[in-house]
Amino acid sequence: MDGEMTASPPDISACDTSAVDEQTGQSGQSQAPIPKDIAYHTLTKALLFPDIDQYQHWHHVAPMLAKMLVDGKYSIHQQYEYLCLFAQLVAPVLGPYPSPGRDVYRCTLGGNMTVELSQNFQRSGSTTRIAFEPVRYQASVGHDRFNRTSVNAFFSQLQLLVKSVNIELHHLLSEHLTLTAKDERNLNEEQLTKYLTNFQVKTQYVVALDLRKTGIVAKEYFFPGIKCAATGQTGSNACFGAIRAVDKDGHLDSLCQLIEAHFQQSKIDAAFLCCDLVDPAHTRFKVYIADPLVTLARAEEHWTLGGRLTDEDTAVGLEIIRGLWSELGIIQGPLEPSAMMEKGLLPIMLNYEMKAGQRLPKPKLYMPLTGIPETKIARIMTAFFQRHDMPEQAEVFMENLQAYYEGKNLEEATRYQAWLSFAYTKEKGPYLSIYYFWPE
């Protein structure tokens, strides 16, 4: 589209609950309530977008992002900083905006987009996070069929603004976990067509930004499915092989062996790998699994690595999981692919965190929430926050959720809060995150 665009679409409301003075930077004398997403509305008056896709991504994501920043008690300055960063760095790499009948590159973040918002809750407060797959239109028209190039273009921009980002691990791990240009050249057209057809979602990279009050922490997720199909490896061989390739001194080998033994025993394969984009010596590696057998017994088995983790944190965390699982009424049973596609149900997921100097892997469980009414989830979360010394979160959780999905019936909706992740340490207590899906 030739013209540049600004201003809010006519259906965007400005009537959310008011923000406190220090969050908005505005006088408390105003008679009209100040909308939570005032920073979004203000920036919209000054932002020009080069195409309609960036314009649509901004107006789709920024209102909810702005509200989350207010709810997380970010200063007014950081609210504008992080919203501007989204507009200038992230929106340009979200690709063609998906709409009915438009045949564009597909990712499943947030349910149907290339971007997902989430919130982390601890006793110290909440943190807003954004995850996305960098993509450009070339992935939709066949020039970059496996979307290999967009992530590098994004990192070149991110490093200009976020000096703490170190992409050494991106280069080292990409070789082992993603389809490289050399791999693609070595495949004939028949093989390429097969992979393009068999993999409805071709995601190989996802970038996540923790928008902390102390600054941004960047993480990268590597999805080795296409690489494994081309090379004949298992996901576990690819992920643990990649870790060992960069862990030259073997600091993580005993942790890897512990996790690998459980994977072999439980007949589960690694799904993807995550690392912090920092100095490789200080990064955390997280190996993920996704299990369609959604039962508490299976979750317990994975949480304890088949009984291999017997420390106090694991035991206390397991008791909390049992309570949450029962209260939430997690929809159980083996999930067939049709149930995931047609009913939108999700598997259980876990990750196992490893870091040099760490004695044991740290498990984190992702409980699938789709199919459960949003208000029920919110009531359970409110009660949980009250029990675990998070009174501020308990007071506002339900109200905040309704603000994120303004005008939606949360008594009937069952697909907005998609995942609840949980980890536990005695030092910090419960560590929970909610991952949000976009309305259809």
Swiss-Prot record:
One of its GO terms (molecular function) is prenyltransferase activity. InterPro entries: Aro_prenylTrfase (IPR033964), Aro_prenylTrfase_DMATS (IPR017795), DMATS-type_fun (IPR012148). Its EC number is 2.5.1.-, 3.4.11.17. It catalyses: harmol + dimethylallyl diphosphate = 6-(3-dimethylallyl)harmol + diphosphate; an N-terminal L-tryptophanyl-L-alpha-aminoacyl-[peptide] + H2O = an N-terminal L-alpha-aminoacyl-[peptide] + L-tryptophan; (R)-benzodiazepinedione + dimethylallyl diphosphate = (2S,3R,11R)-aszonalenin + diphosphate; (S)-benzodiazepinedione + dimethylallyl diphosphate = (2S,3R,11S)-aszonalenin + diphosphate. Substrate binds at T108, E116, F223. Residues 20-32 have a biased composition (Polar residues). Dimethylallyl diphosphate binds at R129, K219, Y221, K286, Y288, Y366, Y431, Y435. Keywords: Aminopeptidase, Hydrolase, Prenyltransferase, Protease, Transferase. Residues 1-33 are annotated as: Disordered. The keyword Magnesium does not apply. It comes from the Eukaryota. GO terms for biological process: alkaloid metabolic process; protein prenylation; proteolysis. Accepts only dimethylallyl diphosphate (DMAPP) as the prenyl donor but shows broad substrate specificities toward its aromatic substrates. Also shows tryptophan aminopeptidase activity with preference for linear peptides containing a tryptophanyl moiety at the N-terminus. Belongs to the tryptophan dimethylallyltransferase family. This is Cyclic dipeptide prenyltransferase.
